[in-house]
Amino acid sequence: MKSVLVAAVALVDPDGRVLLAQRPAGKSMAGLWEFPGGKVEPGETPEAALIRELKEELGIDVAAACLAPFSFASHAYPDFHLLMPLYVCRRWKGIVMPRE
């Protein structure tokens, strides 16, 4: 079975609110809620993937030092096995705005 490495992050603002996004219609698992993040490319660290994905998806800049490891998910789907490190981030530069 193919393994897929996806990194995700819980963005927590100063008021303790956590950003979640709803998966759009037409994508697998449409309608479910998820943390921002994405696939880790070959040769890329999970932290580097999150820095890239947060810039692409939300237009914010995050330093690797601001990504704190929090948890880990491992789940077998029919076609692949998901491996997902989850981080927490409480500091970033820019205003969170959806881009995708």
Name every feature range the model reports, one short phrase each:
Residues M1-V6, D15, M29-A30, H81-L83, ...:
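A structure-centric signal for secondary-structure junctions around beta-strands
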Residues R17-E56:
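Conserved Nudix-box catalytic region and its N-terminal flanking loop in Nudix hydrolases
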Residues D61-S71:
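A short coil-to-beta-strand element that immediately follows conserved catalytic motifs
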Residues V4, D13, S71-V96:
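Active-site-adjacent beta-strand/loop module that shapes the phosphate/pyrophosphate-binding cleft
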Residues K55-I60, K93:
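Conserved amphipathic alpha-helical interaction elements at protein-protein interfaces in regulatory
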Residues M1-V18, K39, F72:
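Conserved N-terminal beta-strand and adjoining loop/helix that marks the start
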